[in-house]
Amino acid sequence: MTTLRLLISDSYDPWFNLAVEECIFRQMPATQRVLFLWRNADTVVIGRAQNPWKECNTRRMEEDNVRLARRSSGGGAVFHDLGNTCFTFMAGKPEYDKTISTHIVLAALNSLGVMADASGRNDLVVKTPDGDRKVSGSAYRETKDRGFHHGTLLLNADLSRLAIYLNPDKKKLAAKGITSVRSRVANLTELLPGITHKQVCQAVTEAFFVHYGERVDAEVISPDKTPDLPNFAETFARQSSWEWNFGQAPAFSHLLDERFTWGGVELHFDVEKGVITRAQVFTDSLNPAPLEALAERLQGCLYRADKLQETCEALLVDFPEQEKELRELSAWIAEAVR
């Protein structure tokens, strides 16, 4: 009986694909070696412990219908589009070893005519006259008895969009600049014009089979019917939920300030698990009562633009004479946290 399992997703939904990955990882026998191949439509994928409001331009993402997906592994934020080929290798311990999966990906690239090397902990790079350029990045997750290595191969990704949706660390930005960060990345189509997602998947699959000396038929995973995976519906519901993607952010504080014709306003929020735990309002408005009431009502509110707007507009019942101010305030808060 084979110890290999090959799964290929025909969905571009990041929440679907990450839910499939999670279910397979949790229920696989410890003796199995799994390769899962997939790709996502426009998505920012963040690490398990990251704050989306800090890492991403959430307002621009909403405008452009770019999804946010939190993965279960650590590491940084990345932008996925259909120009990325994603892979996940899984194995039980003690066999799990990320150097094996890295070797398989390097062998696949080599078979296509691309000589790449592992660099640092997470990257695969190719040497060019301009220096090393990254063609793959990875992240890892381990539990007591198993582990996985997942990553992307940059096939024909729209690299310019990295700068639009990801807010780089200001120190990195000052030191390197957006252009130099972008120049360190390369698409495989620059090295192999015409290369396709299907060809990359075939190369990785063949290298996987060769390494283990076994072959197995691929299982195609489709959203057209619920995958036959234990607890998939619950896992997908969690993976696609606001509570997981936004609410799992580490505790943080947010300061908003604005000057209106009727006065200046400063809002201080403390947020834990996507919920406002403390709100303070400072203002030089001649009528601070509605703002003081707002601070009280915001405690316990979800840190979501629509919920903040609802809370603000609910004050119109108690303060109808301040309708103009409250509507301006409501629109500003919603825009500031979107």
Swiss-Prot record:
<dbReference type="InterPro" id="IPR045864">
    <property type="entry name" value="aa-tRNA-synth_II/BPL/LPL"/>
</dbReference>
<dbReference type="GO" id="GO:0017118">
    <property type="term" value="F:lipoyltransferase activity"/>
</dbReference>
<dbReference type="InterPro" id="IPR004143">
    <property type="entry name" value="BPL_LPL_catalytic"/>
</dbReference>
<keyword id="KW-0067">ATP-binding</keyword>
<keyword id="KW-0436">Ligase</keyword>
<comment type="pathway">
    <text>Protein modification; protein lipoylation via exogenous pathway; protein N(6)-(lipoyl)lysine from lipoate: step 2/2.</text>
</comment>
<feature type="binding site">
    <location>
        <position position="134"/>
    </location>
    <ligand>
        <name>ATP</name>
    </ligand>
</feature>
<comment type="pathway">
    <text>Protein modification; protein lipoylation via exogenous pathway; protein N(6)-(lipoyl)lysine from lipoate: step 1/2.</text>
</comment>
<feature type="binding site">
    <location>
        <position position="71"/>
    </location>
    <ligand>
        <name>ATP</name>
    </ligand>
</feature>
<keyword id="KW-0547">Nucleotide-binding</keyword>
<comment type="subunit">
    <text>Monomer.</text>
</comment>
<dbReference type="GO" id="GO:0005829">
    <property type="term" value="C:cytosol"/>
</dbReference>
<dbReference type="Pfam" id="PF10437">
    <property type="entry name" value="Lip_prot_lig_C"/>
</dbReference>
<feature type="binding site">
    <location>
        <begin position="76"/>
        <end position="79"/>
    </location>
    <ligand>
        <name>ATP</name>
    </ligand>
</feature>
<dbReference type="GO" id="GO:0016979">
    <property type="term" value="F:lipoate-protein ligase activity"/>
</dbReference>
<dbReference type="Pfam" id="PF21948">
    <property type="entry name" value="LplA-B_cat"/>
</dbReference>
<dbReference type="InterPro" id="IPR019491">
    <property type="entry name" value="Lipoate_protein_ligase_C"/>
</dbReference>
<feature type="binding site">
    <location>
        <position position="134"/>
    </location>
    <ligand>
        <name>(R)-lipoate</name>
    </ligand>
</feature>
<keyword id="KW-0963">Cytoplasm</keyword>
<dbReference type="InterPro" id="IPR004562">
    <property type="entry name" value="LipoylTrfase_LipoateP_Ligase"/>
</dbReference>
<comment type="function">
    <text>Catalyzes both the ATP-dependent activation of exogenously supplied lipoate to lipoyl-AMP and the transfer of the activated lipoyl onto the lipoyl domains of lipoate-dependent enzymes.</text>
</comment>
<feature type="domain" description="BPL/LPL catalytic">
    <location>
        <begin position="29"/>
        <end position="216"/>
    </location>
</feature>
<dbReference type="InterPro" id="IPR023741">
    <property type="entry name" value="Lipoate_ligase_A"/>
</dbReference>
<dbReference type="GO" id="GO:0036211">
    <property type="term" value="P:protein modification process"/>
</dbReference>
<protein>
    <recommendedName>
        <fullName>Lipoate-protein ligase A</fullName>
        <ecNumber>6.3.1.20</ecNumber>
    </recommendedName>
</protein>
<dbReference type="GO" id="GO:0005524">
    <property type="term" value="F:ATP binding"/>
</dbReference>
<comment type="similarity">
    <text>Belongs to the LplA family.</text>
</comment>
